[in-house]
């Protein structure tokens, strides 16, 4: 039945690694935790069970833009779905809630904050919720890269329901410590845990310490002219500067960051998505839910603040399984930029001073490991796998540390 649902609604003939185990667990009412790298198809793991189980599935996600994309895709596949978040007007919210109460939807996406509103809580009491899926589940852990205190209250919401639904938790990047936190803090019951593995053999990893970062970037992009790729920058200002330089140099590039209007972001995203503009220059605001398989390179113009962030962003390359390059342009000044950003992150009003201090301490620890990746000798792939708790018995023989730039895919 799972295969039939997958084929009927999503047009796939077979499950990807790890998906079927997750689907079988959830449809047999066993909680599940899926740790699957970006592009492994996490959404199928809860969308297929949602269609097989009676009642309605609630999907908790902090990513408002991703919700809209997922719901649009589900609707086009003939699945009645909706989202409830702050992008709706009060009237739209009222109508969506009314339809939800009438049983019009099979899958409802909600922001975690929505669980705390009296109107949603009242609705949930009378709805037959059969599945509750938690996306970006690492947000529940102080040891995760993006701790959100509101996630700590998900378990209480579940406990308040008349009947406990089966729970699925999903994340792209979680160390062993974060996995244990997810199970404990979401109160998962004897979960089936699936880790599909972090190794992506088709990705070539390289760290370059250029004398001139702009010149190094231009050199790579000229070599890869016509190919689709993403250039990540640490700040909006850097995105603007880099994108302008590329355009002046005759490279067809567009930009994406949170400072642009919704309209401009959407337009630029579509240019990149549909191959009318091959190079996207962006902050980390770009990429969540972007389903583009032919990205041939991801270049980090500056060092990210953590291995979690780096691997999630680099992992947007080569999702079609073909060879792709992940190149980081490292400069010692990146450390000061990253430290400044950690120290000047807006304090989260839902956190105590002690929690904020603990999170900052963890952020600094993660930054130090990121610097190790850029500066210490040794296989880059092995470093990544060990960081995420996987066994890396030997060097890969296929990264800049193992064999220098000579084994990059020079297309």
Where are these regions (language model features)?
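Helicase motor core with emphasis on the C-terminal RecA-like subdomain
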Residues: 3-9, 13-17, 21-43, 50-53, ...
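C-terminal accessory/connector segments of nucleic-acid motor ATPases
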Residues: 346-411
